[in-house]
Amino acid sequence: MKFSKFFAPTLKEAPKDAILPSHVFLIRAGFIEQLGSGLYNFLPLGEMVIEKIKAVIKDEMDKTGALQVNFSFVTPSEFWQESGRYNVYGKELLRIKDRKENGFVLSPTNEESSVKMIANKITSYKQLPIHIYQINTKFRDEARPRFGLLRGREFIMKDGYSFHANMEDLKREFDVMEKTYTNIFSRLGLNFRAVEADSGAIGGSGSKEFMVLAQNGEDDILVCESCKYAANIEAAVRVKREAPCAAPETEKMQKFHTPNMKTIDDVANFFKVDKFFTVKAVIKKAVFVDKSEIVLFFVRGDDELQETKALNACGALEFEDASEDEIKKAGLIAGFCGPAGLPDDINFYIDKELKNERNLIVGANEKDYHIVGFAVTNFKDERFVDLSQVRAGDCCPKCGAKLDIKKGIEVGHIFQLGQKYSKAMNAIFLDENGKAVPFFMGCYGIGVSRLLAVMIEAGHDEKGCIWNTQTAPFKLEIIISNSKDEDASNFAIQLYEKCKNAGISTLLDDRKERFGVKMNDFELIGFPFAVLVGKGLKDGNVELIERKGLNKKIVSSGEIFETLKGILC
């Protein structure tokens, strides 16, 4: 391709709301353009990268025997009502109606569509397993679209759905997909981790996220360098913490007057104890499909409540801040809540690490009073759940080594859905005994357009993008420093034809632009290599530039083609 015939409009400045490097450079370098909030066009350079990503995904998926399909982007509302997700999904699900008042949704995901495609067509265990996937446009009505392609409203996604006769076969496919996704992201040249994760709105039991490690990552990941355990902070677990010092001695449980001491710091300082021996009460207003209510969560005083764990514990859609009036109406006294003596209608949960702990300080459920010497016993087992947020320095649940926190960006997620959707939608098959059984399902997603941004978050410098050879729109750019130099132009064209015939994707910058403009565009767009054909040609030399590090090397004009073949073929 010749640059003079190509469409790659570059900009000197990025939009003011572009903060992350990927957002800034993808717009400035002419890969994408913004249409509206969370909406983007892909220009030729961007589309070329997207197609390369799709090709890698398709190649690896097809190797597993998965079959490519294409679901309608617009899905009848009754599919989502049948699965039970129509109201649960919330405002991110864009609901529309046609001229006949028929309801539809713009699909953010396609579990329902996949069930409809398979149900009543696959009827026997003999036809299982089957795995279908698509690479298609999705829409999620984000409340605050930001960070360019990392948090847009319209996006491209690969989503796959597998159907099985039993849980064992689903787990087998889950492991196959973990290996397949590992192959995909490795081929794309990414530094990533597969981590334990929360299933979120998709549901199901086991799930893993694939996180690319990046300084500007939106997620915190707990990692163990000793055994390679890794988990999203929403799902991370730890070895039960040990007391940092001896517990305060108390002969019996007593109530103490603690005027205006509403915080853990106040209480710990008053009793001169480590916060480890106090219990923190966190009051939340939990929102459900048909109601909202006050829920209490208890964790150690020096721990923080992990909100996703808390949502999963009580089954709420989301939390809202409870007003003072709502707290009082519920019969609670903020700052002095404890697990014993709560109003009968208050739902509460206790972090499992507190089970059977003794000599703790808790709220007395009475204004200006705390209880010392409290024992967390005599509570039903269902009250105890994992609620604490794991942090750096906590001990790995697999090997006991210290955990560290890294930043990551999610690029893929795989789920064991089990029978959640097949039961809800009455999608059944006949098993070996002739019994009607709901399918066991798996779900497997990759953020295709998000990967475009992730690659730049992981590969850029202050000048622009740095593409690797696996995903670059062109592996090589040949730059004619002066388009009026006939010898340089002729040599560059000959080299361009040789590279093209050798299968090296090459862009010839033959534009009648100043040399500085051409170099700035090369550094901004970020092709892996460039050959500069300029004044040195008179001495039989050209300059080979590697975009990563902008390392330059003088190469004989007679040897440059073989050098390029050695690097890029």
UniProtKB/Swiss-Prot annotation:
This is Proline--tRNA ligase. It catalyses: tRNA(Pro) + L-proline + ATP = L-prolyl-tRNA(Pro) + AMP + diphosphate. Transmembrane segments: none annotated. It comes from Campylobacter hominis (strain ATCC BAA-381 / DSM 21671 / CCUG 45161 / LMG 19568 / NCTC 13146 / CH001A). Belongs to the class-II aminoacyl-tRNA synthetase family. ProS type 1 subfamily. It comes from the Bacteria. GO terms for molecular function: aminoacyl-tRNA deacylase activity; ATP binding; proline-tRNA ligase activity. Keywords: Aminoacyl-tRNA synthetase, ATP-binding, Cytoplasm, Ligase, Nucleotide-binding, Protein biosynthesis. Its main location: cytoplasm. Consists of three domains: the N-terminal catalytic domain, the editing domain and the C-terminal anticodon-binding domain. Catalyzes the attachment of proline to tRNA(Pro) in a two-step reaction: proline is first activated by ATP to form Pro-AMP and then transferred to the acceptor end of tRNA(Pro). As ProRS can inadvertently accommodate and process non-cognate amino acids such as alanine and cysteine, to avoid such errors it has two additional distinct editing activities against alanine. One activity is designated as 'pretransfer' editing and involves the tRNA(Pro)-independent hydrolysis of activated Ala-AMP. GO terms for cellular component: cytosol. CDD domains: ProRS-INS, ProRS_anticodon_short, ProRS_core_prok. Homodimer. Disulfide bonds: none annotated. Its EC number is 6.1.1.15. GO terms for biological process: prolyl-tRNA aminoacylation. It is found in: Cytoplasm. InterPro entries: aa-tRNA-synt_IIb (IPR002314), aa-tRNA-synth_II (IPR006195), aa-tRNA-synth_II/BPL/LPL (IPR045864), Anticodon-bd (IPR004154), Anticodon-bd_dom_sf (IPR036621), Pro-tRNA-ligase_IIa (IPR002316), Pro-tRNA-synth_IIa_bac-type (IPR004500), Pro-tRNA-Synthase_IIa_type1 (IPR023717). The gene is proS.
